[in-house]
Amino acid sequence: MADIAGKLPGRGAWVTADIEIVRKAVTGGKLARHLSKDAGRTQVNAEFLFENLAFQVSRQLAASLSMLRRAGRLVLGRMTIEQNPHPAGLLVADDASQRETASLISRLQPDWIEYGLPAQMLGRVASRVSLAYASVIRDAAAPEDVMTDRLVADIAYWRAFGTAQPDKIGPEEGCHAD
């Protein structure tokens, strides 16, 4: 079982998000020896393991986005974003217009910007097919913004895998907002 959220007990095994490294770890049962008592009977397929981890990381990112939205800290859509100046962060979809993005950034001046998130993932959080922009609002009441830090970490994990398929994430997996 992959500990994507980092909450399971024990030492576990860590493998970098590189399919070649995963293949090497799986070769000869090296990974199975560290993860299972029944190493001789356990067959691990590197491609399946990597795709499964990528999917789980993608789900975790969608869940973080949904949680921010439910907390009222994720503003979706360009028109709504423009009404909330000085966001902590700006999320730009992979199909967003470069001209509109530059205009939005110059007007809002967010602290950080994440480019290239799938438009379908952002849209699903908003109960739409796709969405070009979302902004993260600061939590003024908290000295440390744990939810935003978690989102940034989840985006970094998702980028490391690069093969995630966010379009397969839907309400049946529990990542749908509201």
Task: Set out the residue ranges of the language-model regions.
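N-terminal cysteine/histidine-rich coordination modules
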Residues: 1-43
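Long, charged, low-complexity intrinsically disordered regions
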Residues: 33-56, 63
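Conserved mixed alpha/beta catalytic, RNA-binding, or beta-rich assembly cores of soluble enzyme
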Residues: 55-83, 87
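Short helix-coil boundary/hinge micro-motifs
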Residues: 86, 102-111
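Local sequence-structure signature of Cys/Sec-based thiol-disulfide redox active-site neighborhoods
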Residues: 88-95
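Nucleotide-binding motor/catalytic cores of P-loop/tubulin-like NTPases across gene-expression machines
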Residues: 98-104, 119-124
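Short basic, glycine-rich beta-strand/loop surfaces that mediate nucleic-acid
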Residues: 109-159
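Charge-patterned, long linear interaction tracts outside catalytic cores
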Residues: 166-178
